[in-house]
Each structure stands twice: as C-alpha cells, then as structure tokens.
Amino acid sequence: MPAFKSRIESALADRKAQGLNRSINVVFSGNQSILECEGRRYINFSSNDYLGLANDQALVRAWQQGLSVYGSGSGASPMVTGFSAAHSNLEAALTEWLGYERAILFGSGFSANQALLLTLLEKSDVLIQDRLNHASLMEAGMLSPAKMKRFKHNDIAHLNSLLSSEDNHLVVTEGVFSMDGDCAPLADIAEVTSSHDAWFAVDDAHGIGVLGESGGGSCELAKVKPELLIVTFGKAFGMSGAAILCDHATGDFLTQFARHHVYSTAIPPAQAYALTHAVSMIQEQSWRREKLTELNEAYRDGLQDLDGFVETQTSIKPFMIGESELALQVASACRQNGIWVTAIRPPTVPKGTSRLRITLTANHTNEQIKTLSMALKQALGAL
C-alpha cells in the first residue's frame, strides 16, 4: 500500500477510535437563528453571526447593488486589476472607524494572520503568543523563522518574564478567545509591551462589532491601540474576509511582501461593497449590541445553576462537560429537543475540557434561551 494511503487511513482510524471524528452538516436555511438540517428545524446556538446581519435585508440589498455594479468576482489579484473602488471605500471606512492609517484586505482571518506573521517576522525576532491563541496564529508562528514563546493564558506576569529590552518582540493575543469567550487584559498587555518597546498585535475576530461603544471591539472597550489589529468579517459582519489595520509604512510593506495578499484573487467587489454598508450598520445600530446584553442576562439567569455554566461578557458561552463522549451525548440530546449546539473536543480544546460552544446572536429571543435551558437540564439529567 502506498505510504500516503496508509498514513491517511491510519490517521482516520485513530481519530474515530478516540471519538474525535468530525462530520459536515448540510443546512438549508442559511445563517439564521432557526436552521434546517435533514428535514428538521432547530434553534441555532452555533452561529458566529453575532449581530444578526447575515440575513438582514438591507445588507442583502447592498450585496445585490454591488453585484449589479461590479459583477460577481474581482478577476485578479489586488496588485493587478482586482482592486476596485469598492475595495478602496471599504478600506477607508475601516480606517476612519478604527483609527488607523491603512487597512489591508484578505480573503479570510486565517489568511490574514498567516500573512502578518510570515511576512513581518525574521529569524532575529521573538514572537510571544497567548497559549490559547487561534490555530492560524500558532501555525504561522511555528512556520515563521522567529523564535516563538507562549505565555500562560492572560497571565501578565508570565508575559513580562518572557520579554526583554534586547530582543525585537511581537506580542500577539486574541481580543476575545474563540473557545472560552473571555477577554484578554488588553490594557495591561499594552502597558507591558510598551515598557519593553515591543510591538503588539490583537486578533479581534470575535470582539469587533460586538464590544465597544461604536462596535469597535475589544480595543475600543479597553481604550488601547495596538500597532496591529486584525478584524474578520465572518462573525459580526455577517459575511467573510478580513483586514489588517496598521500604519502607512506597515501597510505598504504588507502590500509589497505579503504573499497571501499579492498572490490571491481579491475578494469580490460586491462583497466589499456590502461590507462597507455593514461597517455603517455596526456603528449606527447599537440596538444590536444592546440586544446581546439583554440575552446575556437571560442566559445567565437561566443557566447559572447548572454544572458546567461559565459566565462571559461576550456572545461566546462555553458550557463545560469534560470528556469528549459526554459532550457528544449532551449535544445529541439537545438536538433531539430541537436545539443545535456543537460539541467542541480535542484537538480544538485541551484534553479533558470538551464543552458545548454556545453562541448568542441578536436574532435570538429570551424564549429561545429558556428552551435552551430546559433542553440542557434534560440532557444533563439523563447522563
């Protein structure tokens, strides 16, 4: 048997034996609070569409308007003919809103994170990351020529001990951690990095749009401005793509040397057109964030007495189970009661910390939270 085939079959068999096999579910209802799968309807508590913009008709119309003007695709790299007025307007809207000189667009958050670290870092640099950072950041750190260190999750003292004034450091954290829903102590990290003359980068995929007075995210809430800010459009924006916010020189550097940017087809101009509308909607429609605050309170009131409850100030609500098989059982029992929640297992989270990753969106209702609470109580009682 060829080595590749043997290796593939062995890896798949091991994954199944450990109870960690994953499958793809085909849904028919789009990204909404109610989803349809295999002929059944569920209340969807697994969507990252935090502000409920993905199916907002104003945003759908903006997509349609963009399509009528620009067609379906960009047709080229941004460095050739793929950068339209729609892309330029989106970059301008982002920089004005978030207070940076440049915004460089990418097709995904994964791509943006990889591009940033692989382009910026050299062998003489030291990269210091929170140990719970996203896989895209960790992989990029391992692939980069820099020396990578990891500090204990949100541990400022440990971070400080890893910094020195002699080395060229880049410190990277998420603003909101995707599996735990907790926030990084950004003000403290900014103070420590500044004292060591280090650069600071924040991946705010899950904070942008949701936190801060204008929806400016974790950094707006903490009143900090890192040298580098990564925002993604696949969560609160209701679409996909990402941008790196930075100063003029760094923006020019990424434009010239970031291979993910130079050698990729630009995102569709109609998408950029719609994203520009989303930027305005996020800032102007604060009622969406207010609705999330209300739902957070309803979630706490309904579930705080259950073993596994974890309180967060964000839309991400980890419900801790422990073992992978138990997490799958609870998720399955919830689905039998019309609740779609996803069991998160290793290697996404550390062994022994499997959980349900519950997410709230502005399209949910208090009544749906009550239904979730009852389904969880019933599922846990059956273990």
Curated annotation (Swiss-Prot):
Protein name from the UniProt record: 8-amino-7-oxononanoate synthase
Pfam families per UniProt: Aminotran_1_2
UniProt: pyridoxal 5'-phosphate binding residues: 109-110, 178, 206, 232
Gene3D superfamilies, per database record: Aspartate Aminotransferase, domain 1, Type I PLP-dependent aspartate aminotransferase-like (Major domain)
UniProt key word Hydrolase: no
Encoding gene, per UniProt annotation: bioF
Record InterPro entries: Aminotrans_II_pyridoxalP_BS (IPR001917), Aminotransferase_I/II_large (IPR004839), AON_synthase_class-II (IPR050087), AONS_Archaea/Proteobacteria (IPR004723), AONS_Proteobacteria (IPR022834), PyrdxlP-dep_Trfase (IPR015424), PyrdxlP-dep_Trfase_major (IPR015421), PyrdxlP-dep_Trfase_small (IPR015422)
Organism: Vibrio campbellii (strain ATCC BAA-1116)
Quaternary assembly: Homodimer.
GO annotation (BP), single: biotin biosynthetic process
GO molecular function, one term: 8-amino-7-oxononanoate synthase activity
Cofactor(s) listed: pyridoxal 5'-phosphate
Family matches, as HAMAP family: BioF_aminotrans_2 (MF_01693)
